[in-house]
UniProtKB/Swiss-Prot annotation:
Extent of Polar residues compositional bias: 609-623
NCBIfam families reported for this sequence: PRK00290.1, PRK05183.1, prok_dnaK
Renumbered residue ranges of the record's region Disordered: 603-644
Phosphothreonine carried by residues: T199
Gene name tied to this protein: dnaK
Protein name, per record: Chaperone protein DnaK
Composition-biased stretches (Acidic residues): 629-644
Keyword Disulfide bond: no
Role description: Acts as a chaperone.
Similarity field: Belongs to the heat shock protein 70 family.
Pfam family membership, one: HSP70
Segments crossing the lipid bilayer: none
Amino acid sequence: MAKIIGIDLGTTNSCVAVMEGDKPKVIENSEGHRTTPSIVAFTDDNEILVGQSAKRQSVTNPEKTLFAIKRLIGRRFDDPIVQKDIKMVPYKIMKADNGDAWVRVKDQDKAPPQISAEVLRKMKKTAEDYLGEEVKEAVITVPAYFNDSQRQATKDAGRIAGLEVKRIINEPTAAALAYGMDKKRGDSVIAVYDLGGGTFDISIIEIAEVDGEHQFEVLATNGDTFLGGEDFDLALIEYLASEFKKDTGIDLHNDPLALQRLKEAAEKAKIELSSAQQTDVNLPYITADASGPKHLNIKLTRAKLESLVEKLVERTIEPCKTALKDAGLTVSQINEVILVGGQTRMPLVQKTVEEFFGKEPRKDVNPDEAVAVGAAIQAAVLSGEVKDILLLDVTPLSLGIETMGGVMTKLIEKNTTIPTKATQVFSTADDNQTAVTVHVLQGEREQASANKSLGRFDLRDIPPAPRGVPQIEVTFDIDANGILNVSAKDKATGKAQSIVIKASSGLSEEEVAAMVKDAQSHAEEDKKFKEMAELRNQADSLIHSCEKSMKDLADELSEDEKKGIETAISELKEAVQGTDKARIEDKLKVLTDASAKMAERIYAKKSSEGQAAQGQTQSQESTKPAEEGVVDAEFEEVKEEDKK
C-alpha cells in the first residue's frame, strides 16, 4: 500500500516525514538536510530553484527569489498586513483580478498556492527518492489560526503539486501528536507554544486514555497568523538600515540587492545571538555613492536584539491568556509546555514562556521537526497503520452569517470540536421578499463587516409572504480539515442551495486545473533537464578518461586506432555542446566502443607490470598497479553497461 506522507509546509523551512513501522522518520533532502528552506527562485534561463539552491542565489537575484510566501496565502491584497509586507520584501506583490495578493515574477503573475506548490513538489520528490516509489497522498499542516481561505489555498497548493491532500491538520496539534505518541499513558494537559517563521499559535491539548485509545483533544486554540521569525528579522533589518543611514545618509531600502544581503546577515546574527552574547554584522561593499564604496560594520549584543524584539515576544502572551480562558483552565493546570518552531530557540522567548506558565518548557521535542513528525503520525492513522490514536481538533474562529442590521449571528462558536454541524432557522427582512443572500463570515466581532468574509450565495424563488413568515434553514457543516460547507433551504418549498465555501477570492476550479497542468509540464522539463545533465556528465567523464588513457598508451596504439578514438572524442565534444539527446547518446556509444579495446590493453599492461615487480611483497604486488588498472577498466566497462 502506497505511503501517505506528512508535510510541514513552513513559512521559513519545510520538512517531510513518514511512518516506518511504528516509528516516524524525518526524511533528508537531496542536499542531506532534514529541513528545506521554503524559498523558490526563478532564474533567467527558465529554471525553477527550490530550497537551499534558491537561498544560495538570493543575494544576486532578489526580485525573482520568493520567500515567506505562506504569509500571503489566502490573503487579500488590501489586507493591512499584506500592505506592510510589500514595503519589506524585494519581490513584487500585486493585486490579482479577484482581489487576492499575488506575486509578479518575470512579467508573470503567480498565485501564492502556485509558489507553495513548488516547495511541496520538492518535499514529495524527497519522500519518493527515499521510499523508492511514487507518492500521491499527504497530510499537510497549517497554523491553527488559519482561516477557511488559507486552508483552502493550502489544499490547492497540494493539488497543484500533484498531491491528494488527505487531511489538513493544525501545527500545534501535530506537535502534540509527536510529543505524546511515545509518552507514558495517562491523562495530561499540555500547552503547545508554536512560534515559527511567519505565524504564532498556542493550543491547549488534553491527552487522555479513552477506551484503550490515546485521545488527543484540543480544548482551545488562539494565535496570530502574521507574527513569527520573519518579523524578528525585519525588526533587526530596520535597526541595521537606520544605523547605516545615520552613518552614511544612504537608505538601503531602495536597493533590493543590499536589502537581501541585510536580510541574510540579520537572520545569521539572530541565530548566533541565541548562543553568544554579541556578534558582528559585517557587510563590505554593501552599496556605493559618489564618494566610493560603503561598508556596514555594526556590533550587536544579545541585549540590543532583545530590546528590538521585546514587543513581538510580548504579543504572544495575550493569545496564551485567551486560549487558557477559552479552555476553562488556569496556568497551574497545565502539566507540560512544549515549544515548537525555530524562533523558540531564542532565550528571550524561552524565558517569557517560562515566566508565563510558571514551568520550564520541555527540551525533548525538536522544534523544527515535531510538526512534520505529527503529520506523519496522522497520515499513518488515516492509512490504518496506527490504530489506537484519536485526534479531536477544533475550529479556531467562530462561523456565522450576516443578519439584519449588519450583525454577525454565530452558528458555530470558536474552539468547537470538528467535524461538526449546526443548523439555524432564519426568515426574511422585508414583505414579499423572494430571495435571500446568505453572507458567510468567520471571526469574533459582532459587526459583520469587521469579520472575514468567506463567501455569499443566493437562495431564490421563495414564495412571496409577509416578513418573518418564510422559514429559511441554514446549515453549517465543517469537515475534519476545518473546511466549511454551507447550505440554505426554504422549508416551505424544499428548494435548497449549497456551496463548499470558496473564499470570495480564492482560486477557481479552472485556475487550479491550469496550475496543475503547468506544474506537470515543469516536472517533465525538470526530468529532461536532469537526464541531459547526467548524460553530459557521463560524456565528459568518458572523454577525460580516454584522453588520459591515450597518453599512457601513446606508443602502443596504431595510427588508425589513435585517429579513430580522436575522431570519436571530437564528435562527442561537439555533440555535448548541443541539445540533441539522441545524438549525444549515439556519439557516446561510438566512443565507448572505440575505447573498449584500449581499456583491455591498459588492463593487460598493468597486470604484467604487477607480476614483473619481483622485489615487493605479495600484497604490494597485487595492490597499487592492479588497483589503478581495475579502476580505469571498470570505469570504461560501466560506461559501456550504461549504454546497453
